[in-house]
Design a protein with these regions (language model features):
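AAA+ P-loop NTPase nucleotide-binding core of proteostasis motors
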Residues: 1-337
Length: 337
């Protein structure tokens, strides 16, 4: 367990306590033999890592993970996809290994949107009640089209031993006056936390059905990322976009790329202003390096280094190139000194 926690923290920044709690709860649920109290409510704003944590955790545990967009779920008889469709996809993805499928982590993502007042119609309420049935443990029958036979092959899939996570931003809950810590409604990791919402608050404010009470005993809220968190993601995460860009320049142009400290700070600042968490980092880094990448690949072998400064983040053509010959002279002079 400690090894898995460390691996997650090497990638996901700003959620140390929350990772500890989630991994511990998952281990407890896996060892739970009575099939009760296995629902987790995982909340957090856009881009804080809800889906990524779940997929990585499943990878490290060597179990399947299926993330289902709850907004796309419909009741039988309505146009759209139902739970059986997603279970069929999972079954085929796992090469029809039923034992693995029935041990999977199932994430019902954006469940708050399905339960919002705008969508809380007969269909929306029906879908949420279906999810609670899924959580309680039931069986679904999926039909597979087999090439060798004219009729569908029926497969029964039990959810009794699946780990079920309800995921969403639930911004209407966390932006409620009694839970906000500043006038913007965002909570930074270094800000003092007010009282945490209870499941009753999610029912009253977040439009979860009353039947949720008692079924989601574990509530984990991922922190909204601060500007410093975003900077640390760039500098320290093993999935940092800067790391990938450095590899790209090295592999495709045989050139090093260096970001000044001020450039890192500006990228984090621009991403923070967008309030979409870590998701915006990739686009900002990509846009800031696009013209430099095009130049060094067009003139392959000519340049040894690219320097990205704070000015490059706002003016993407404003970067510095170090030719290979000049770099050789600089290295020679250093040795002489």
């Amino acid at each position: 367990r400690k090894n898995i926690i460390k691996k997650l923290k090497d990638i996901i920044i700003g959620q140390d306590d929350e990772i500890d709690q989630l991994v511990t709860e998952i281990f407890r649920l896996q060892n739970n033999q009575n099939g009760k109290n296995k629902g987790i409510l995982l909340s957090g704003s856009t881009g804080v890592g809800k889906s990524r944590i779940c997929t990585l955790l499943a990878k490290y545990l060597d179990i399947p993970c299926k993330i289902i967009d709850t907004t796309q779920l419909t009741m039988p008889g309505y146009r759209g996809q139902n739970i059986e469709d997603f279970l069929e996809q999972l079954y085929l993805d796992e090469r029809k290994n039923l034992k693995r499928v029935e041990k999977a982590i199932i994430v019902f993502d954006e469940v708050d949107k399905k339960g919002s007042r705008d969508n809380y119609d007969v269909s929306g309420k029906g879908v949420l009640n279906q999810l609670l049935k899924f959580l309680d443990g039931t069986e679904y029958t999926i039909g597979l089209n087999e090439e060798s036979v004219l009729q569908k092959t029926k497969v029964r899939i039990s959810t009794n031993n699946m780990i079920v996570i309800f995921s969403g931003a639930f911004s209407n809950v966390y932006n409620a006056p009694k839970f906000t810590t500043n006038n913007l409604g965002f909570r930074e990791t270094n800000a003092p936390k007010s009282k945490e919402p209870t499941l009753q608050d999610f029912i009253d404010i977040g439009c979860l059905p009353d039947e949720s009470m008692g079924r989601l005993p574990i509530i984990i809220h991922l922190n909204t990322l601060s500007e410093n968190d975003l900077k640390n993601i760039l500098l320290h995460s093993k999935e940092s976009d800067i790391y990938y860009v450095k590899q790209e320049f090295k592999n495709e142009a045989e050139a090093d790329i260096k970001f000044s400290d001020e450039a890192i700070e500006e990228i984090a600042h621009q991403a923070y202003l967008l309030q979409t968490g870590a998701r915006s980092l990739q686009k900002i880094v990509h846009d800031a390096t696009y013209h430099a990448f095009k130049k060094v690949t067009d003139d392959f072998g000519k340049y040894s280094k690219v320097i990205i400064t704070k000015d490059t983040i706002t003016d993407h053509k404003n970067y510095t190139l170090i030719p290979k010959e000049q770099n050789k002279v600089l290295q020679k002079n250093k040795k002489m000194l």
